[in-house]
From Swiss-Prot:
Its EC number is 3.2.2.23, 4.2.99.18. It comes from Sphingopyxis alaskensis (strain DSM 13593 / LMG 18877 / RB2256). PROSITE patterns: FPG_CAT (PS51068), ZF_FPG_1 (PS01242), ZF_FPG_2 (PS51066). This is Formamidopyrimidine-DNA glycosylase. Belongs to the FPG family. The active site is at residues 2-3, 58, 260.
Length: 270
């Protein structure tokens, strides 16, 4: 599933094609993805001008001068493509601009979603109401983690994947950050020493910043809007590297936590 860096890469890739552009036509090629498209999607967006593109957690937001906001989630296999042409088998939504750009939402597995809200999307979209802070914002710090982790027996990895604790983190980048901070993903959250919480915050910021700069990670389906791969996968410290050597010299192992693969080094992550 695309995580924060992939969605940020997508939003940045859409800006040159959508921001400041009038939406000349909006076309859906099926009635639904994970859930139905909004019935008034085309009516409310056609003729509107896109004023801003932004991101919250793993969602992208397309805002218009009508104070309508189209919120997209890429699901497991979704991506936007900007090369134009005719719709393909797995293209389910088309945005056409007055400048002639044709942007397709491509989603083979159809686990993505499109929502449309009026007014402030951060206040009016239900999925945003309980989200934790953005990990690259000033609101995310060691004190916040200390409060969230207090008396919690759940593994630290599970807590970091909880979108109510911190928004946008997923399996890949949590594995990477825990390795950088030298913290075992199996450790109960309450057991993480306070001295290590600042290191964990720094590691999360560093991993996400590097991943965004590299265009995210391509695991199976993800491509940026212009069709580029996400090159951060070449720099993974532990993710997907079972049996290889950690930079400390220890062996990277894979375990399963809550149905997800966890990669870490038993030598340096304690």
């Amino acid at each position: 599933m695309p995580e924060l860096p992939e969605v940020e890469t997508t939003v940045r890739g859409l800006v040159p094609f959508l921001e400041g552009q009038r939406l000349a036509a909006v076309t859906t090629f099926r009635p639904d993805l994970r859930r139905p498209f909004p019935v008034d999607l085309a009516q409310r967006l056609t003729g509107a001008t896109v004023t801003r593109l932004s991101r919250r957690a793993k969602y992208g937001i397309v805002s218009t001068d009508r104070d309508d906001h189209m919120i997209f989630h890429l699901g497991m296999s979704g991506r936007w493509r900007t090369e134009g042409g005719e719709p393909g088998k797995h293209d389910h939504l088309l945005l056409e601009t007055g400048a002639g750009h044709r942007l397709f939402l491509h989603d083979p597995r159809r686990f993505g979603s499109i929502d449309l809200v009026a007014g402030d999307p951060l206040a009016s979209f239900a999925a945003f109401v309980t989200l934790g802070p953005e990990p690259l914002s000033d609101d995310f710090d060691a004190a916040l983690l200390a409060r969230a982790f207090a008396a919690r027996r759940a593994p630290v990895k599970a807590m970091l994947l909880d979108q109510n604790v911190v928004a946008g983190l997923g399996n890949i980048y949590v594995c990477e950050a825990l390795n950088m901070a030298r913290i075992s993903p199996l450790m109960p959250a309450a057991g993480v020493p306070k001295a290590k919480l600042a290191a964990l915050v720094s590691a999360i910021r560093a991993v996400l910043t590097a991943a965004i700069a590299a265009g995210g990670s391509t695991l199976r389906d993800f491509l940026s809007p212009d069709g580029d791969l996400g090159y951060f996968a070449k720099d993974w410290r532990v993710y997907g590297r079972e049996g290889e050597a950690c930079e400390c010299g220890g062996a990277i192992v894979r375990v399963v936590q809550s149905g997800r693969s966890t990669f870490y080094c038993r030598k340096c992550q304690r």
